[in-house]
């Protein structure tokens, strides 16, 4: 399994400055509000990425999942995993997340790179069964639809697109993630 890696020609100070500028702040995009009555124990476990806006760290990946578990320090361990058909390898990144405010609000900060954190905002959630979640990052270029199943109903996908579009996300640029049993 290959870990997500930065190109070797980039040095740490340049990467640190760039990363801090891009996701160093923990902020909320205009109009995006975290859900209330968030229950972390129910959110933990495996989620399938159904749709996303494109970013280099996930480019070309299929079968993408996110797995959340408790850390010893009270935070959340995050393992993102996806399959690169081009390289025929699984890529994995491990991060950590902590609540920004109260633990009953779906607003966390997440880091995959040292001390730099970006927003992780759960702005829509199936609060009955915790079967789907709509996620934003620190601005409207970050958007994900997560589901407990790799093939949610089309009506739920349509609900995600409508909600995201109403909030000003570029839904015409969404990437729909392929999930199959043939990877790896």
Language-model regions: role of each:
Residues 2-14:
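Bacterial N-terminal signal peptides that target proteins for export
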Residues 19-184:
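A beta-rich soluble binding module of mature secreted/lumenal proteins
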């Amino acid at each position: 399994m290959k870990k997500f890696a930065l190109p070797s020609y980039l040095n740490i100070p340049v990467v640190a400055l760039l990363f801090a500028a891009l996701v160093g702040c923990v902020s909320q995009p205009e109009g995006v509000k975290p859900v209330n009555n968030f229950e972390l124990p129910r959110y933990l476990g495996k989620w399938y990425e159904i749709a996303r806006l494109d970013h280099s760290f996930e480019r070309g990946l299929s079968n993408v999942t996110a797995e959340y578990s408790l850390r010893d320090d009270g935070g959340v361990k995050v393992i993102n995993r996806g399959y690169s058909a081009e390289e025929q390898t699984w890529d994995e990144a491990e991060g950590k997340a902590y609540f920004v405010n109260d633990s009953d609000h779906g607003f966390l900060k997440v880091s995959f790179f040292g001390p730099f954190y970006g927003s992780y905002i759960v702005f829509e959630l199936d609060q009955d069964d915790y079967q789907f979640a709509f996620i934003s990052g620190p601005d409207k270029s970050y958007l994900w639809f997560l589901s407990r199943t790799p093939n949610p109903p089309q009506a739920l996908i349509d609900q995600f697109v409508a909600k995201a579009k109403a909030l000003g996300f570029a839904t015409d640029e969404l990437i729909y993630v392929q999930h199959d049993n043939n990877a790896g």
